[in-house]
Amino acid sequence: MAISALEHATPDMIGTGGATGAGATAILAEIAALLERVAAGGEAVQIDLCGPTCSPQIRAKLLQALGPGEVLIRLKADGESTIRETSVQGVWWNEHTDRYGNLLAAFLEVARVPAILPVDSEQLRRGAERLRADLQTVSKTVD
């Protein structure tokens, strides 16, 4: 499920004008509620950090407030996807850039595990086939 950064925030939480602290506070309050919901068995949620309600200043305040965690994952394809654990367990900072480094998407994911990481059954089967083929090649050169 994806939501905008301030979907459930009340007007007094959002603030006005340059009050980026108030906007970040609203998002952090939303994250706390989402963590409780996911812990109770609810589905994972993504909070869009590139929408019109989430300025670069708010993103910077969120990044500072959430702090770095222990896990950093980089996926390289046509661009780069970076998934960073924050210091708040269950909150993941995701950014996707094109091959030139331009930011395409940024979102916070409240989840046990980021959605991009688990592999499906078909991917597991292909992995087993590849490993078996590699083992045949290795065993011919070792034996």
Annotated model-derived regions:
Residues 25-36, 63, 125-132, 136-139:
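Generic detector of well-ordered alpha-helical segments enriched in charged/polar residues
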Residues 44, 70-71, 91-92:
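Short, hydrophobic/aromatic-rich segments at coil-to-beta transitions
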Residues 34-66:
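Short, well-structured hydrophobic secondary-structure segments
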Residues 1-44, 141:
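N-terminal, charge-rich interaction modules
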Residues 57-87:
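Amphipathic, interaction-prone secondary-structure segments
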Residues 3, 7, 78, 84-143:
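Helix-rich interaction surfaces within compact, conserved domain-sized segments
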Residues 31-32, 75, 102:
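Beta-strand-enriched cores of mature, soluble protein domains
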Residues 17-24, 55, 117, 124:
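Intrinsic-disorder-associated interaction segments
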